[in-house]
A protein has these predicted regions:
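N-terminal secretory signal peptides that target proteins for export/translocation
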Residues: 1-9
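Bacterial N-terminal signal peptides
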Residues: 12-22
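Electrostatic cytochrome c docking/interface patches
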Residues: 27-48
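Solvent-exposed, polar/charged alpha-helical surfaces in well-ordered, non-transmembrane soluble domains
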Residues: 39-43, 73, 86, 90, ...
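Short pre-active-site segment immediately N-terminal to redox-active cysteine/selenocysteine motifs
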Residues: 48-52, 60, 117
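Gly/Gly-Pro-rich "capping" loops immediately C-terminal to redox-active cysteine motifs
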Residues: 54, 58-93, 109
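C-terminal capping alpha-helices of c-type cytochrome domains
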Residues: 97, 108-128
Length: 128
């Protein structure tokens, strides 16, 4: 039997491993009908003529998002930061409503992205 700090460390490691396994399993469980939306949203988010999110944001949860941009906040934990999808949608549609001094373009208001394209990008962002 392990005593003292060793026992505490062993229990801590076990809890962390169990929690990590549960977390990784839960984020990999996207519904099959969401997968095409996520892929399409990712493409729109990274496309220079559309979302161009990589120009300003890091995507720590996406190994294929090759950027060093740090103008805007890192796009991670989006679902927990914006549990209300409508609030995130409004932010993408016209970010000047939340922050009049933002440099982020009003993608919907200025017609850069259609309404359905914003929804696809949100589907992707919710995986981050």
């Amino acid at each position: 039997m392990v005593h003292g700090r060793g026992a505490l460390f062993s229990r801590l490691v076990a809890v962390l491993l169990a929690g990590s396994a549960f977390f990784l399993h839960s984020i990999s469980q996207a519904r099959p009908d969401e997968a095409p939306n996520v892929a399409a949203g990712r493409q729109l988010a990274f496309e220079i003529a559309k979302g161009n999110c990589l120009a300003c944001h890091l995507f720590p949860g996406d190994a294929g998002a090759d950027t060093l941009a740090n103008i805007g906040p890192a796009l991670q934990a989006i679902r927990s930061r914006f549990p209300d999808r409508a609030r995130l949608r409004a932010r993408l549609w016209d970010p000047t409503q939340a922050n009049p001094n933002t440099v982020m373009p009003p993608f919907g208001k200025h017609g850069i992205l259609r309404s359905d394209e914003i929804d696809l990008i949100i589907d992707y962002l919710y995986t981050q």
